[in-house]
Curated annotation (Swiss-Prot):
The record marks H161, E210 as: Could be important to modulate the pK values of the two catalytic cysteine residues. GO terms for molecular function: diaminopimelate epimerase activity. The record marks Y270 as: Important for dimerization. This is Diaminopimelate epimerase. Homodimer. Pathway: Amino-acid biosynthesis; L-lysine biosynthesis via DAP pathway; DL-2,6-diaminopimelate from LL-2,6-diaminopimelate: step 1/1. The gene is dapF. GO terms for cellular component: cytosol. It comes from the Bacteria.
């Protein structure tokens, strides 16, 4: 059978989006891996699936697969594309959309200028909830990699993140250190690794090595986690503008227990069909 899909991106973080509200199919990890190949498939960082909700209090269910076939809990850039997609496809007429994910409910607001704001919910710092192996909760933790200690912040934005402060993101060892942090035994579900360079109280540069995808042009949850870590440690103040390789995201966070608000673009690239 043929399935209709839309290729989208948020700051270069690219997605294949499938509507399984008006189409019916059983998507398995092998499909994500097959379609995610940039040489022989569609090619993407993540596959986003729009489904009818299980919960009557939300509008849609949102599922995410990485290009390696692993299903993950959350994707911030994908959430913005999800909101733009369901409006463009007339699956809803609402500008404020409640969505069920593996890690909870998020709220998407589509603005008149085309930008999308996402209420990502409050960050979580308790090690067991990230999950991260630590004796006690702290603002930062020493993490040993290849005999060297690195100071990291550990945060969950519905998915696990490690955040490291660096002097210059251009020269940071993202491709060497990123996969080693991703697969570090202290992160039992693996982790996304963010490398942040603070410019001033409200601006920073960021690169993210994503769990199951490698370095991407932008990572929405990674930007949220980096902003939360920087504000928590006193390096920065809300609101924060983060420049990633693919462009800029705006993050607001009022402190512990408060939701993280992320605003950025969502772009449709093309429509296509793929054989299941």
């Amino acid at each position: 059978m043929l399935l209709r899909f839309t290729k989208m991106h948020g700051l270069g973080n690219d997605f294949m989006v499938l509507d399984l509200v008006s189409q019916h199919a059983h998507i398995q990890p092998k499909h994500a891996k097959q379609w995610g190949d940039r040489h022989t498939g569609v090619g993407f960082d993540q596959l986003l699936i729009v489904e009818a909700p299980n919960n009557p209090e939300v509008d849609f269910r949102y599922r995410i697969f990485n290009a390696d076939g692993s299903e993950v809990e959350q994707c911030g850039n994908g959430a913005r594309c999800f909101a733009r997609f369901v409006l463009d496809k007339r699956l809803t007429a609402k500008k404020r959309i409640r969505v069920e994910t593996k890690s909870g409910i998020i709220v998407l607001d589509v603005q008149n200028d085309g930008q999308v704001s996402v209420d990502m919910g409050p960050p979580r710092f308790i090690p067991a909830e990230i999950p991260f192996v630590a004796d006690a909760q702290a603002l930062n933790y020493p993490l040993e990699v290849d005999g060297q200690l690195h100071s990291i912040a550990a945060v969950s934005m519905g998915n696990p993140h490690a955040v490291l402060r660096v002097d210059d993101v251009q020269t940071a060892p993202v491709h060497e250190l990123g996969p080693k942090i991703e697969n570090h035994p202290r992160f039992p579900q693996r982790v996304n690794a963010g490398f942040i360079q603070v410019i001033d109280r409200h601006r920073a540069n960021l690169r993210v090595w994503e769990r199951g995808a490698g370095e991407t042009q932008a990572c929405g949850t990674g930007a949220c986690a980096a902003a939360v870590a920087a504000i928590s440690q006193g390096w920065m103040d809300s609101p924060v503008s983060l420049d990633l390789p693919g462009g800029r995201l705006h993050i607001e966070w009022a402190g512990p227990g408060k939701p993280v608000m992320m605003t950025g673009p969502a772009v449709r690239v093309y429509e296509g069909q793929v054989r299941l």
